[in-house]
Design a protein with these regions (language model features):
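Short, low-complexity disordered leader/linker segments with a strong preference
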Residues: 1-42, 56
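Short, well-ordered beta-strand elements
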Residues: 39-52, 91, 101-104, 123-126, ...
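N-terminal lobe/hinge region of extracytoplasmic solute-binding protein
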Residues: 46-97, 221
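Extracytoplasmic/secreted proteins, especially bacterial periplasmic and envelope-associated proteins
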Residues: 66-70, 80, 84, 88, ...
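Sec-exported extracytoplasmic/periplasmic mature domains
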Residues: 76, 80, 98, 111, ...
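Aromatic- and charge-enriched surface segment that lines or borders ligand/interaction sites
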Residues: 91-139, 174
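Surface-exposed binding/hinge segments that line
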Residues: 105, 124, 135-202
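Gly/Pro-rich hinge or "lid" segments in bacterial periplasmic/extracellular proteins
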Residues: 170, 180-251
Length: 258
């Protein structure tokens, strides 16, 4: 199981940096990794090449993953030591006896960076987007264990209501798999399954489109421990602490510069 977890995280980027980001949220960084600017704790990370984008459902690169890890959070998150799935946006979940139905409880305190409350519908919308044949997301297969997800993604099924995802109520997200999948929770640690903000996606007509302006700093809405502050192409991307993050009290850094 641990080998699979490592492979899943490596698919989404650099494992070591993912750990560094996780630890930076709950601990002070080591000297040399951070700099103080006006009394603020800023972590500086050399991030390699310029980003394709920071849309979690369309990108595939390591540099993108590093930034997305700071800006978004999925239903579950990897434990920094064991790599096992632990609660993220979902505070808890149950699994049916036949191992095919997962029921996630979305935190009442979970919010988007603009203050909007998160709900189960955010995940229904976001998973519909990544499975959209028109979007053509490279990592759509991460959700293929879900009932009828592959058929919808490949265009052989047109009715998304037949896909095994459902908002049972505002804070209850139910997922039905086509067969028992022991590693399903591990798949949910991949950034492609992270939620995107429905109103923002719709405002910029990004449901089936790539490269729209929703990921610009003035438009961006995420749900992670940090929010997008500045993006100077080919120079630097800066994120700052998201005070609307449900667990912001453990975020020791004021920002990260990539």
């Amino acid at each position: 199981m641990k080998k699979f977890l490592k492979k899943t995280l490596q698919l989404s980027g650099n494992l070591g940096l993912a750990f560094a980001l996780l630890f930076s949220l709950s601990n002070c960084t080591k000297s040399g990794n951070s700099a103080s600017a006006n009394g603020k704790k800023i972590l500086r990370i050399g991030n390699g090449s310029e980003l394709q984008d920071i849309d979690p459902q369309t990108v595939t690169g390591v540099p993108e993953h590093n930034v997305i890890s700071a800006l978004f959070e999925g239903l579950v998150a990897p434990h920094p030591e064991t790599l096992e799935p632990q609660p993220g946006v979902a505070e808890s979940w149950t699994i049916s006896k036949d191992q095919k139905i997962y029921t996630f409880k979305i935190r009442e305190t979970a919010k988007w960076s603009n203050g909007d409350k998160m709900s189960a519908d955010d995940f229904v919308f976001s998973w519909k987007r990544i499975l959209s044949p028109k979007l053509g997301a490279e990592y759509s297969y991460m959700l293929f264990p879900v009932k009828n997800a592959e058929e919808y993604s490949k265009g052989t099924l047109k009715d998304f209501s037949q896909v095994g995802v459902k908002a049972k109520d505002a804070q209850t997200f139910e997922v039905t798999l086509k067969a028992p999948t022991p590693y399903f929770l591990a798949l949910l640690m991949h950034y492609s399954t992270f939620p995107v903000h429905k109103a923002t996606i719709e405002k910029f007509n990004a449901m089936d489109s790539r490269g729209t302006k929703w990921t610009r700093p003035e438009n961006f809405v995420g749900n992670g421990p940090f929010k997008l502050a500045k993006w100077d192409l080919n120079k630097v991307l800066t994120v700052e602490k998201n005070t609307n993050y449900w667990n912001n009290q453990i975020t020791k850094l004021d920002g990260i510069s990539f």
